[in-house]
Amino acid sequence: MKRSNHTGKRTILYLIIAVVALMPALVPPAATAHETSAGSVSHHARGSRSVVSSAVLAEPAVIGSAKAEGQQEIKQPARSRIAIIVDDFGNDMRGTEEMLELPVKITVAVMPFLSTTEKDARRAHEQGFDVLVHLPMEPKQGKPEWLGPGAVLTRMSDAEVRKQVEAALDNVPFAVGINNHMGSKVTGDERVMGIVLAVCKERGLFFVDSHTNYRSVAGRMARKIGLPPVENHIFLDDVHTASHVVKQMRLVQERALNQNYCIAIGHVGIQGKETAAGIRSGIAETKDSVEFVGISELVRDEWQWNSQLTPP
């Protein structure tokens, strides 16, 4: 009897050991981080780029990709970006050289029908900078002589508005778009802005609302016809000192880091050298945390803008 009991206990012990050894095969593995981190990949409202959370530790399959079996490489998100537009080129204004010598990409907005319009546009293009037509547009207030030649006015007929816009585009080579010089009255006028935007669309261009009018209809109307609603966020030189421009550049950096990008506007002109000096100092402070790009690159990525540009 003792031998039988001893043998039975040994058999039970062997069975327990066998069950323990088989347990890893019977219990399903824990889920990986990317399967349990809901919302760890979030898309910006513009639909341009993805921000991948640090919680995503494993590489997920990409549905619909040719490399859907875990072979798709996840790119790290690009740095926040800043596009600086410098207005009022075209008349050899003070600060022109200093702006063109800045150590990052800028966008050069050139007024049409002036003494150095073509020269400034060509030089900017040759240096790899984007060019915009800085189109004079009627303001609510201000002296008419501030507008310059070729201005778009609300009293013009539809045909006259179209003629002015097309002539300005023909006068500024290499333009990828238009932004408004002054224009607080025009950008609030649906009829006139409808014509301006229609010409932009016909030519494969976009419109940058300088935001001289907080009741501007430009963005809303651009969306309606399939154009990107691009707008200025911060004026750098609303106070004409280099120290103020540096402060504004810090605001630009803050917005870019919080919102993924920022568009800012400065000017050549009476205080153009001071503005350029402030921008240069601001670049030195911010260049390690953001990327400076031309407006066309920003528009292409943020709004998936792939329209074919009309050659000069």
Please place each PLM-identified region on the residue numbering:
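Terminal interaction modules at protein C-ends
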Residues: K2-S80, M249-R250, S289-S296
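Active-site beta->alpha N-cap acidic-glycine motif
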Residues: K75-E145
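Hydrophobic faces of well-ordered beta-strands that scaffold small-molecule active sites
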Residues: I82-V86, V104-V110, V131-L135, I178-N180, ...
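Second-shell loop/turn segments in exported
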Residues: A83-I85, F89, K105-M111, G148-S157, ...
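Alpha-helical scaffold elements lining the catalytic groove of polysaccharide deacetylases
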Residues: W146-D170, T187-V192, G219-A256
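Active-site groove signature of glycoside hydrolases
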Residues: E166-V186, Y261, I265-H267
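Basic- and aromatic-lined ligand-binding clefts that recognize polyanionic substrates
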Residues: N179-Y214, A218
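C-terminal domain-boundary segment and adjacent tail
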Residues: C200-N213, Q271-P312
